[in-house]
Amino acid sequence: MTKLEVCCYSVDCAQIAEKAGADRVELCCGQSEGGLTPSVGALMQARETVTIPVHPIVRPRGGDFCYSSNDFTIMKNDIARIRDLGFAGVVVGVLDTDGHIDMPRMREIMSVSGSLAVTFHRAFDMCQNPMIALKQLAELNVARILTSGQQQNAELGLALLKDLVAATKDQGPIIMAGAGVRLTNMQKFIDAGIRELHSSAGRTVPSTMRYRKAGVTMCADSDVDEFSHYCVDGEVVEAMKSLLVMGAPLAKHT
């Protein structure tokens, strides 16, 4: 059966996702940056309170995926901490200046990861040649690739996603579709034989604060509403999981 991974920007969201039936959680912080490494406190709390597999992302900053020496050392330290805390997996990705998989650095990451299941994240969507990147990641023995099919959303990238699934039919990383995967379009991914889906399944909820200071923000973008935040919608997760269960006979290569 096709699995559902829910992207969670807090431990609260991870707990909601688990209760609603998610198969796995990608734990992040920094939603506006597209997902950054969660704090040590968040990692510890997730280990203590979430029982389904949790895969923290390791991404020290927003922007591109070509990192300085300091950034890379920080990433390895974070991966080692995640490994030692006993998580099931980790989500990471490193590219070189020419938009290829940085193989020397990824080999170091795989070594530090030990028994962690490694997901190569959407840095894959920034690669020059996706099929070459797929071959390289297979050589590294990564567990899965999170990808939108190198498009702005996974529905637009379905053609490449199907090619990637076909190329990994017999062996290689699991192809996990992500970016714009919703209840309304997920049947398309099931029909394409995609084994795992990644969704934030979320909504914006208002702050619980009654007093709201006007004219002062903590964000560089003063137009951002800081009295709201993004949260996993448990009802949406339940509905997505129900559709996956019903659509199980349609899912190929499971």
Curated annotation (Swiss-Prot):
GO MF entries: copper ion binding
Entry GO terms, CC: cytoplasm
Main location: cytoplasm
Protein localization: Cytoplasm
Pfam family, one: CutC
Keywords: Cytoplasm
Superkingdom, taxonomy of origin: Bacteria
InterPro entries, sorted: CutC-like, CutC-like_dom_sf
Signal peptide start-end: none
Nucleus among keywords: no
Similarity comment: Belongs to the CutC family.
Protein name as annotated: PF03932 family protein CutC
Gene that encodes it: cutC
